[in-house]
Amino acid sequence: MSGLTHFDAAGHAHMVDVGGKQETQRIAIARGTIRMLPATFALIRDGKAKKGDVLGVARIAAIQGAKRTADLIPLCHPLALTRVAVDFELDDALPGVHCVAQVETFGRTGVEMEALTAVQVGLLTVYDMCKAVDRGMVITEVSVREKRGGKSGDWKAEDTAG
């Protein structure tokens, strides 16, 4: 199991010891997309969904998702997040919505999982609020786009289109 930090020498799962790591500013940016029917897109764009402000509710859900990541992903460390920012971009061409989450902390481990969870929960909330009119929505292309801080340094996805 070499290279996989969440397994010990015997192959058993464990939470990685970060006690000896330096505390640094950690930032991660994740992005994902939900594709939908044009009529569903219009409901969101025009603020006419029966359940209310889809993107407003999805933003709050995404922030809550980032905060609850350690409760959902068994080997994630609970982190004191210093910032969670979530933005939605309407894309007429898809049609669909892009979700971008930036998560920050000052600590010993990165916040990539928190950023990914924020995006997923935000997009799942869009699905939940619109599924009555469009069960065929597709959540896609969820990925970490950038991370900063820590021993491994900064990283940015080569495909900067997303």
UniProtKB/Swiss-Prot annotation:
The keyword Transit peptide does not apply. Substrate binds at L75, C76, H77, M113, E114. It catalyses: (8S)-3',8-cyclo-7,8-dihydroguanosine 5'-triphosphate = cyclic pyranopterin phosphate + diphosphate. The active site is at D128. GO terms for biological process: Mo-molybdopterin cofactor biosynthetic process. Keywords: Lyase, Molybdenum cofactor biosynthesis. InterPro entries: MoaC (IPR023045), MoaC_bact/euk (IPR047594), MoaC_sf (IPR036522), MoCo_biosynth_MoaA/MoaC (IPR050105), Mopterin_CF_biosynth-C_dom (IPR002820). GO terms for molecular function: cyclic pyranopterin monophosphate synthase activity. Its EC number is 4.6.1.17. Pfam families: MoaC (PF01967). Pathway: Cofactor biosynthesis; molybdopterin biosynthesis. Homohexamer; trimer of dimers. Belongs to the MoaC family. Catalyzes the conversion of (8S)-3',8-cyclo-7,8-dihydroguanosine 5'-triphosphate to cyclic pyranopterin monophosphate (cPMP). This is Cyclic pyranopterin monophosphate synthase. It comes from Burkholderia ambifaria (strain ATCC BAA-244 / DSM 16087 / CCUG 44356 / LMG 19182 / AMMD) (Burkholderia cepacia (strain AMMD)). The lineage of its organism: Bacteria, Pseudomonadati, Pseudomonadota, Betaproteobacteria, Burkholderiales.
